[in-house]
């Protein structure tokens, strides 16, 4: 569960390491983002030679949350951190690699590129 002012790890190779959630996209009353939801983020920590610089504003999709996500079969999935993947202006991935596991819910939300690049889909 991610909300405004939440800090997330970045799970791709764009050069950003940590971002701050500015806004949850998807309506005026949407307060929390879960796995597969889009958010607007500001880069708070970045590597010196990365393509994304500190202070840059971008959209991102949440790929892991510490808050458990309920599946249709009644099971739950939970991760050790909150993480996202940065997106470009047309909704495509900005990076070329994805680090760490991602949730299967991304497949249902049509983020096939992220699912195919992830080392593990849980």
From Swiss-Prot:
Keywords: Ribonucleoprotein, Ribosomal protein, RNA-binding, rRNA-binding. This is Large ribosomal subunit protein uL14. Transmembrane segments: none annotated. One of its GO terms (cellular component) is cytosolic large ribosomal subunit. GO terms for biological process: translation. PROSITE patterns: RIBOSOMAL_L14. It comes from Christiangramia forsetii (strain DSM 17595 / CGMCC 1.15422 / KT0803). InterPro entries: Ribosomal_uL14, Ribosomal_uL14_bac-type, Ribosomal_uL14_CS, Ribosomal_uL14_sf.
